[in-house]
């Protein structure tokens, strides 16, 4: 019974992240929604790992790797956003067409 609740929560988080990623106009908000999507995938990995084989930690270890990749993605993404803000004075996605210049 607990697995269903966690999976439903994960689907809700994934849906909120996708909706936010599609409708977001701000780069920082888009990065936050992308991290929300990755965290919902981590919840699924840990839940299915515990559901199918509770003695092995394959899903948990893979989840740690996904968290490390998400941290690197956030650091690089925020560095790019701060660089764009320094040059363009805006973090809006529709105002930062870098191919024009």
Swiss-Prot record:
GO molecular function: oxidoreductase activity, acting on NAD(P)H, quinone or similar compound as acceptor; quinone binding
GO CC term (a single one): chloroplast thylakoid membrane
Primary localization class, coarse: plastid
Family: Belongs to the complex I subunit 4L family.
Keyword Nucleotide-binding: no
Subunit structure, interactors included: NDH is composed of at least 16 different subunits, 5 of which are encoded in the nucleus.
Record membrane topology: Multi-pass membrane protein
EC number, UniProt record: 7.1.1.-
GO biological process, one term: photosynthesis, light reaction
UniProt name for this protein: NAD(P)H-quinone oxidoreductase subunit 4L, chloroplastic
Compartment(s) where it occurs, according to its Swiss-Prot or TrEMBL record: Plastid, Chloroplast thylakoid membrane
Catalytic activity: a plastoquinone + NADH + (n+1) H(+)(in) = a plastoquinol + NAD(+) + n H(+)(out); a plastoquinone + NADPH + (n+1) H(+)(in) = a plastoquinol + NADP(+) + n H(+)(out)
Keyword Signal included in the entry's annotation: no
Transmembrane segments: 2-22, 61-81
Summary of the function given for this chain in its UniProt record: NDH shuttles electrons from NAD(P)H:plastoquinone, via FMN and iron-sulfur (Fe-S) centers, to quinones in the photosynthetic chain and possibly in a chloroplast respiratory chain. The immediate electron acceptor for the enzyme in this species is believed to be plastoquinone. Couples the redox reaction to proton translocation, and thus conserves the redox energy in a proton gradient.
Family annotation (NCBIfam families): PRK05715.1-2 (NF004320), PRK05715.1-4 (NF004322)
Keyword entries, A-Z: Chloroplast, Membrane, NAD, NADP, Plastid, Plastoquinone, Quinone, Thylakoid, Translocase, Transmembrane, Transmembrane helix, Transport
Pfam families: Oxidored_q2
InterPro entries hit by this protein: NADH_UbQ_OxRdtase_chain4L/K (IPR001133), NUOK/Mnh_C1-like (IPR039428)
């Amino acid at each position: 019974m607990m697995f269903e609740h966690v999976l439903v929560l994960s689907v809700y988080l994934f849906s909120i992240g996708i909706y936010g990623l599609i409708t977001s106009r701000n780069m920082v908000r888009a990065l936050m929604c992308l991290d929300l999507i990755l965290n919902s995938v981590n919840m699924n990995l840990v839940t299915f790992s515990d559901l199918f084989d509770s003695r092995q930690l394959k899903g948990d270890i893979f989840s740690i790797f996904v968290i490390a990749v998400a941290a690197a993605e956030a650091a690089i993404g925020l560095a790019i956003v701060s660089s764009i803000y320094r040059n363009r004075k805006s973090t809006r996605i529709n105002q930062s067409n870098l191919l024009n210049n």
